């Protein structure tokens, strides 16, 4: 993926468009060598709007590109389309220099440790902020330990880099003005080569105020510096206001400014010496002990204040609370500082062309990176050290939310969030769906652990991600699938109080050669509302249900498509009586396209269709009074009052027939 500033655009059948200066995000494949910064190129490809998220929790790439000023997305395949480099050297000198320096630093700080990708990627991420080659489990460990700001370049790293430069230059006896004049350009250049992050800009601007202020007899003030940095950044780029990095960075610093001293006063018993012992009588050992206690208390107060400041924002953005970060930051911030110091020494050795010293320093950083990864994994594994919370539970009431995810190519996953907060997953999609859709949705839904997972049948697009789901979210019970509890028609499973999942199909002893013919069919009953989950059941299953008189009455039907047979039979639709049917229309694969006559059948039954391909994920909110359906992508909304037609079994004494 690379940004492209347009000079000319010609659209097939529409001629040339006036687009000079507009930016496109280009996805390249089959192009070797890849274009470099400043190349003038001519290409042919598919121009489109960036895809919007279809499921809750998915990354909104379209909004991200809009904030960065991109007008659209271009996909180019060099094997079938045209991609030609005309000339080079058309970029700015500053950006070209920054990119060359970034590449040189990446090679210098990982010299001789590249055979360990995990540690090398960690060092590179902490020094340069590049996370492309970082294993997902390493990132997850830093997120779970509440130390992600330590892992990726942030305002913390810029501040540490400024302190390192300041102290090194002061060792040479230079005057303050000269030290400031040398330090600040290097600090801003570091911000430039590490990606121009809002938090890094904030730290650089505040460092400039703190360092340069005394030259004009001005004392630094944290709140003034914070406000000034915010004013400058928002004046240059107002879109920063909508970036989590910006609000988290400024929110944490604001909390530090307001809460650090009050928290330190509360910790006074931990660090203040005996007031009746004169300082003149301190021994060297006591002085060292009091100094250490003071530093620990200050570090702890900073950690507490920053955690309190970031907690509301972390809940709002990521549904995450990390109390273990109070302690983890004390360890990992020190390790991060050590890694940055050693990396600066390695860069100096590489610049002097001392490969042996460079390799030795990088091996020291390898050990520090290993300690950092190990510490992050240890703190992330502490029970209760991090957990997800959903603030909407404070006001949503006794609602059962059923989210039917919109997954491509026949994938299926349905998330059931019961009134008391128990989470169940009915099918889990394929492996390709997990990181893109299923995992982000469950994280945004504040799932700490699944109460259970139900696997309807052995289709890789329905159950392929089962192991990934279990590894990330656990599962108290597993119904269906290999090693799970058997799904048998007539059985009922209570997912929560008042939330029942009844198995309608398959019956005991059912034999079928195709996986879709063994697909389980369920009736979900909540608050008197019934949702029929037909899955990929086809002709044999639907015929069996209609011939055996199984009660299919429901308010909403959720239906997939059989991979090779007819489904959606008229008798099934009529027996259901559902007012809404949720399906996913797709032209690929062909089996995911509705069969001929489908629209006529549902019209004859008075059903309204909700297409996941248009609405995105559909959220069903089941209440005692009925069900509300809302589309995630298109914002559609439909409210159905409950019919109250719930199948029951009664026992009593018959009276006289009138």
Indicate residue ranges for each PLM-predicted region.
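Core dinuclear metal-dependent hydrolase active-site scaffold
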Residues: 131, 234-235, 242, 376-452, ...
């Amino acid at each position: 993926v690379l940004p492209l500033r347009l000079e000319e655009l010609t659209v097939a059948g529409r001629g040339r468009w006036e687009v000079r200066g507009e930016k496109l995000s280009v996805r390249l494949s089959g192009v070797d060598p890849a274009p470099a910064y400043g190349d003038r190129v001519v290409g042919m490809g598919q121009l489109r709007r960036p895809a919007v998220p279809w499921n809750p929790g998915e990354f909104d790439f379209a909004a991200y590109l809009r904030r960065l000023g991109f007008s659209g997305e271009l996909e180019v395949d060099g094997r079938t389309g045209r991609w030609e480099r005309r000339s080079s050297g058309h970029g700015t000198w500053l950006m070209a220099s920054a990119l060359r320096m970034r590449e040189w630093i990446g090679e210098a700080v990982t010299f001789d440790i590249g055979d360990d990708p995990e540690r090398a990627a960690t060092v590179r991420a902490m020094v340069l902020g590049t996370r492309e080659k970082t294993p997902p489990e390493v990132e997850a460990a830093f997120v779970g330990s509440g130390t992600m700001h330590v892992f990726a370049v942030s305002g913390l790293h810029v501040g540490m880099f400024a302190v390192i430069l300041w102290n090194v230059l002061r060792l040479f006896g230079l005057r303050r003005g000269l030290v400031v004049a040398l330090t600040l350009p290097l600090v801003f250049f570091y911000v430039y080569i590490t990606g121009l992050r809002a938090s890094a800009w904030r730290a650089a601007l505040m460092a400039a105020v703190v360092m340069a202020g005394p030259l004009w007899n001005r004392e630094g003030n944290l709140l003034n510096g914070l406000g000034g940095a915010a004013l400058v950044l928002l004046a240059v780029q107002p879109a920063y206001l909508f970036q989590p990095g910006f609000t988290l960075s400024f929110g944490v610093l604001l909390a530090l400014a307001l809460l650090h001293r009050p928290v330190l006063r509360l910790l006074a018993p931990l660090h203040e010496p005996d007031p009746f012992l004169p300082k003149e009588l301190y021994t060297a050992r006591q002085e060292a002990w009091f100094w250490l206690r003071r530093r620990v208390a200050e570090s702890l107060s900073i950690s507490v204040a920053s955690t309190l400041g970031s907690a509301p924002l972390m809940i709002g953005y990521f549904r995450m609370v990390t109390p273990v970060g109070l302690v983890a930051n004390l360890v990992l911030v020190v390790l991060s500082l050590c890694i940055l110091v050693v990396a600066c020494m390695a860069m100096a050795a590489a610049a002097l062309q001392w490969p042996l010293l460079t390799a030795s320093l990088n091996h020291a950083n390898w050990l520090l990176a290993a300690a950092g990864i190990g510490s992050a994994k240890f703190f992330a594994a502490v029970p209760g050290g991090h957990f997800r919370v959903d603030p909407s539970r404070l006001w949503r009431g006794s609602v059962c939310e059923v989210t039917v995810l919109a997954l491509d190519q026949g994938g299926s996953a349905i998330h059931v969030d019961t009134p008391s907060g128990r989470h169940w997953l009915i099918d889990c999609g394929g492996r390709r769906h997990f990181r893109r859709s299923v995992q982000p949705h469950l994280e945004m839904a504040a799932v700490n652990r699944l109460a259970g997972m139900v696997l309807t049948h052995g289709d890789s697009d329905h159950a392929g991600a089962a192991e990934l789901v279990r590894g990330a979210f656990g599962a108290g019970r597993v119904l269906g699938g290999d090693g799970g509890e058997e799904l048998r028609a007539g059985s009922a499973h209570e997912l929560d109080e008042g939330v029942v999942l009844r198995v309608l199909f398959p019956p005991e002893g059912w034999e079928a050669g195709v996986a879709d013919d063994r697909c389980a069919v369920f009736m979900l009953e909540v608050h008197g509302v019934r949702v029929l989950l037909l899955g990929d059941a086809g002709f044999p299953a639907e015929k069996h249900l209609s011939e055996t008189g199984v009660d299919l009455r429901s308010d909403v039907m959720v239906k997939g498509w059989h991979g090779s047979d007819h489904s959606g039979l008229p008798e099934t639709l009529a027996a259901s009586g559902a007012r809404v049917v949720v399906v996913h229309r797709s032209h690929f694969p062909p089996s995911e396209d509705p069969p001929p006559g489908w629209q006529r059948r549902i019209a004859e039954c008075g059903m309204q269709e909700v297409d996941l391909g248009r609405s995105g994920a559909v959220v069903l909110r089941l209440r005692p009074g009925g069900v509300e359906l809302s589309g995630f992508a298109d914002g559609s909304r439909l409210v159905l009052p409950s019919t109250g037609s719930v199948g029951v079994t009664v026992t009593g004494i018959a009276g006289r027939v009138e």
